[in-house]
Design a protein with these regions (language model features):
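C-lobe/activation-segment region of protein kinase-like
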Residues: 114-139
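Conserved alphaE helix
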Residues: 78-96
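Short, charge-rich binding segments
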Residues: 48-49, 95-97
Length: 139
């Protein structure tokens, strides 16, 4: 996986998780798919390039990452089932856009949920090259 540096930013009423990578955003179909489509279950993303590096900005407005959410309260069995179903749906959804599961960041700090847990959003990072089954083990 490419070296990545994560930071957070607030602009007006929006919040972003920004991942700076040493990969230059080249004409990569995966990146184009992410930028030009709203993929259900995934954080919207914008890309900025400067000095041979790329910054992917993921909108996280009104969401909190999974560890923060779980620190604040426990989830029920039904909520856990809902999270797992949404994960399965997201994996299926990336296939519709010719993306593979390797780009889904499954580390808990990159998984975002709404305050009511009605929706879960994953981060798709096109420069990750870890098979999905290995990423699930990390989770």
């Amino acid at each position: 996986m490419a070296q990545m540096e994560v930071s957070y930013s607030r602009r007006l009423d929006y919040q972003y998780m920004m991942i700076e990578t040493d990969e230059e955003a080249r004409s990569d179909y995966r990146l184009s798919m992410l930028i030009n489509n709203r993929i259900n279950g995934f954080l919207p993303v914008h890309v900025q390039q400067m000095n041979g590096k790329s910054t992917l900005s993921y909108e996280i407005t009104s969401l909190e990452n999974l560890p923060e959410f779980l620190d604040a309260r426990k989830i029920t069995y039904d909520e856990m089932v809902s999270l797992l179903l949404q994960f399965c749906s997201a994996v299926s959804e990336v296939g519709r856009y010719l993306l593979d599961g390797e780009g889904i960041l499954l580390e808990p700090q990159y998984i975002y949920v709404s305050k009511s847990l009605e929706r879960i959003r994953f981060c798709y990072y096109p420069y990750q090259h870890m098979p999905l089954h290995q990423s699930v083990n990390v989770l």
